[in-house]
């Protein structure tokens, strides 16, 4: 069951939000430099406090989504509005970030628990990204 796999692995991710989220953002910025344009004053070095702080925000939002798997849109509506209407983030960036979150979690959890949950985690991140991009229509 997708839900049980997400609920099993996500608390381990959430408890390291700044580290894992920061690592995912660092990988995103390194691999996709065009995404840096939304953060003009950031220090983009690996252990930057700014990257870790924003990474924690990302993981915290995903933690909230994991608690509301039946209503991700409702749970994160204000955040989605912010990204779509105020920040005007290119919706093509969300799948890129989801990929780097997946890679980071795979690196941090090289055991079987993640192997089983990888597909479900990918679907979860795609659902969150899909909900985010729905605001752009």
Curated annotation (Swiss-Prot):
Sequence positions that bind O2: 54
Tissues expressing this chain: Red blood cells.
UniProt name for this protein: Hemoglobin subunit alpha-2
Highest taxon in the source lineage: Eukaryota
Protein family: Belongs to the globin family.
Post-translational modification: The N-terminus of the mature protein is acetylated.
Amino-acid positions noted as binding heme b in the UniProt annotation, renumbered to this chain: 83
GO annotations of cellular component type: blood microparticle; haptoglobin-hemoglobin complex; hemoglobin complex
Molecular function GO terms recorded: haptoglobin binding; heme binding; metal ion binding; organic acid binding; oxygen binding; oxygen carrier activity; peroxidase activity
SUPFAM superfamilies recorded: Globin-like (SSF46458)
Domain Globin, first and last residues per copy: 1-137
Record GO biological process: hydrogen peroxide catabolic process
Metal-binding as UniProt keyword: yes
UniProt keyword terms in alphabetical order: Acetylation, Heme, Iron, Metal-binding, Oxygen transport, Transport
